Amino acid sequence: KSKARDISACMRILHEQYHDKVPEDFNALLKLPGVGRKSANLIMGDVFGKPAIVTDTHCIRLCNRIGLVDNCKDPAKVEKALWKIIPPEEGNGFCHRLVDHGRAVCTARTKPYCDKCCLADICRARKEFANE
């Protein structure tokens, strides 16, 4: 029910305040009901082609495993850390590649396929999985 209410309220605001257009401003997106950092970044990057870093579960898992962040599960903190090391124009594509890699190779529910991983030589977690 909450999601449906958020969608309805969001559509009403987009119609009344933005004349049926999605705002191109990150902070304006965050003010919309049901829109958080992940959705706002996804819209900024995929819809408007602007710099964005989408920290979903795959991105967070891989950033921890390869050592881009240290045992951090907070999406906002992972996003902040990535902004420091990823060129803005590369952020959106980088995150999409992490999602693809996380689904196909560096999986969460099964043992990752480290032997097929293009990041194996720099991955901190590889040794842990090799010992299992």
Go through each PLM region and give its residues.
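Catalytic cores of DNA base-excision repair glycosylases
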Residues: 1-132
